[in-house]
A protein has these predicted regions:
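Short amphipathic alpha-helix with an adjacent loop that forms part of the alpha/beta core around
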Residues: 28-33, 104
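Short acidic-hydrophobic, aromatic-tinged amphipathic segments that line or gate anion-handling sites
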Residues: 26-27, 88-91, 181
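A transmembrane-helix-recognition feature enriched in membrane-embedded lipid enzymes
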Residues: 1-28, 52, 60, 75-85
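Glycine-rich, highly charged phosphate/nucleotide-binding loops
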Residues: 23-27, 93-99
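Short, flexible loop segments at the rims of nucleotide/cofactor-binding pockets, characterized by
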Residues: 15-21, 89-93, 123
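Short, structurally constrained coil/turn elements
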Residues: 18-20, 34, 60, 108, ...
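Catalytic core of membrane glycerolipid acyltransferases/transacylases, capturing the structured
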Residues: 33-94
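Non-catalytic C-terminal accessory region of glycerolipid acyltransferases
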Residues: 4-5, 96-237
Length: 237
């Protein structure tokens, strides 16, 4: 895959991060393979998660091809950029084409990034996972890499006003150890294992997050924040 668009976009994104004064804590980069296909599965708390996780993976010299909703590809500005970076459009009404495109990318040795919850959660907790990520890894014969991102919701997320000031927010991204799945494995059992790994990573980045969660809109009630519960979040979809 010729990457003519990805490099200049990275330069622009890094310039934005510098302008915002973001303070990064990236962990587990050694778990991102230098070659070969893999599925990276991460939680979804903010609209910039894909760009931040992509930035965190750069030391491994890999470009992640993210699966993202079709509406982003339909936009006159973001659409050409997304296609130029070889991200994968997901049509929620008919996912067959996107599944095949992701499978093809994985078999070519690409890393595909997926938000297995399918949407951002207003609770900032990890919801139930959809099975597509596990099925992709099984079909392509590639490992799954769990990941967690935290802090991005403070910049831009659902139902909140974007905050692009120089706030110097801490941003945490952690990649867990890759694990393999085999064709014939119980999909639900693998999903449960993946979710558990993601929860452990998220708990770790939250525990080490330098800013207090107490009383903050961007933090779940479990950590003393004022975000709605996971159950309430499901009812608001």
């Amino acid at each position: 895959v010729a990457d003519l668009v990805y490099p200049p976009v990275i330069v622009a994104i890094k310039t934005l991060w510098k302008y915002l004064g973001l303070r990064f804590d990236f962990q587990g980069i050694e778990n991102v393979p230098k070659t070969g296909g893999a599925v990276i599965c991460m939680n979804h708390v903010g609209y910039l998660d894909f760009a931040l996780v992509g930035t965190a993976a750069l030391p491994a010299h890999r470009y992640i091809r993210f699966m993202a909703k079709r509406e982003i590809f339909d936009h006159k500005i973001s659409g050409p950029l997304m296609r130029g970076m070889h991200h994968i459009s997901v049509d929620r009404d008919s996912g067959t084409g996107s599944f095949v495109a992701a499978l093809r990318a994985l078999r070519k040795g690409e890393i595909v990034g997926i938000f297995p919850e399918g949407t951002t959660s207003l609770s900032f907790e990890i919801d139930e996972l959809k099975s597509g990520a596990v099925r992709l890894a099984m079909g392509a014969g590639v490992p799954i890499i769990p990941a967690a991102v935290w802090g991005s919701q403070r910049i831009m997320t659902k139902k909140q006003k974007p905050n692009f000031g120089r706030n110097k927010f801490p941003i945490s991204v952690s990649f867990g150890e890759p694990f393999t799945v085999a064709k014939g494995d119980d999909v639900e059992a693998v999903e449960a294992d993946l979710k558990n790994r993601m929860l452990k990573l998220l708990d770790s980045v939250q525990s080490n997050y330098p800013d207090s969660h107490t009383g903050q809109w961007w933090a779940p009630a479990r950590l003393g924040g004022t975000a709605i519960t996971l159950e309430e979040s499901r009812n608001q979809r």
